């Protein structure tokens, strides 16, 4: 169990490792950081020039030995879950898969061809892990 406001089960965190290993064929050292709305907004503004909160930000460093930082905002994830009529756990799973694909080199902001591939992969992984975790009928 990862201790946050929501006490997130480790299986969700392991999903990031599994997706990056599958996509890259190697291990990525990943730090997960849970932030308040204010802090994630500040980082979003500083690094992306976007002055708003977001659910996740991913930063990848290095070429051969990859290291990544994934910043998550539980409050925004919770809001998005309600907005999309989803459970918190399903929304978290989607966000973590999205971040894992960024860690694996996929981008959706600057490359539209890559964006389609990324979102197709995201959906496939999401369906796979929903089934794996018995969440596909919830």
Curated annotation (Swiss-Prot):
Keywords: Cytoplasm, Endonuclease, Hydrolase, Metal-binding, Nuclease, Ribosome biogenesis, rRNA processing, Zinc. Binds 1 zinc ion. Zn(2+) binds at residues 98, 102, 108. One of its GO terms (molecular function) is zinc ion binding. Its cofactor is Zn(2+). It holds the Pfam family YbeY. Gene3D superfamilies: Metalloproteases ('zincins'), catalytic domain. Its main location: cytoplasm. Its EC number is 3.1.-.-. It is found in: Cytoplasm. GO terms for cellular component: cytoplasm. Signal peptide: none annotated. One of its GO terms (biological process) is rRNA processing. Transmembrane segments: none annotated. Single strand-specific metallo-endoribonuclease involved in late-stage 70S ribosome quality control and in maturation of the 3' terminus of the 16S rRNA. PANTHER family: ENDORIBONUCLEASE YBEY, CHLOROPLASTIC. This is Endoribonuclease YbeY.
